[in-house]
Amino acid sequence: MKNKDLNNVPSSMRKVSHMYKDWFLDYASYVILERAVPKIDDGLKPVQRRILHSMRKIHDKRYHKVANIIGHTMQYHPHGDQAIGDALVAMGQKDLLIDTQGNWGDIRTGDKAAAPRYIEARLTEFALEIVFNKNVTKYQPSYDGRNNEPVSLPVKFPLVLAQGAEGIAVGLSTKILPHNFNDLIKCSIAVLKDKPFTIYPDFQNGG
């Protein structure tokens, strides 16, 4: 609708049209950046980044109840315990960044994980080595301003390719297939040596 035609439209409808015009991009950007799509810098969605940051804060080399990790992560993530728990289980099932104990289910059989109060987790040595470096990490205030959280983590490995990613946002979606860990190591070495390489997706469930 052209601006000159707005004169014939009731003021309430004009306000709604302006709200849509002004706020839709803000809403879409929020969903894309804050929930659905991983950041290419570290290959993590916000909930995944907050889980790892929280696990690093409480890390003492011992296993922690998943319920405790979820509660600690809620200091940084405003979207509820269920979203945190689901994301934590999904990362744990990939057996890369999180060392698990108890019944975590199996993506190959469709079995679900036990309740958070019955299973435990801690960071793997691999995660401690390649994900964190406080000297080069930029921080921002958490959603309520009480804490600081990483803008992104200084990951030294192509996590987004190792874990894969899937998400639906406003006006777009992402689906990145997982890749084999050993293949990624070889390709990372090839990149450092400025040599050509070819890599194909891999599937944890054998599909």
Task: Describe each region flagged by the PLM.
Residues 1-207:
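Catalytic phosphate-handling regions of large nucleic-acid enzymes and associated NTPases
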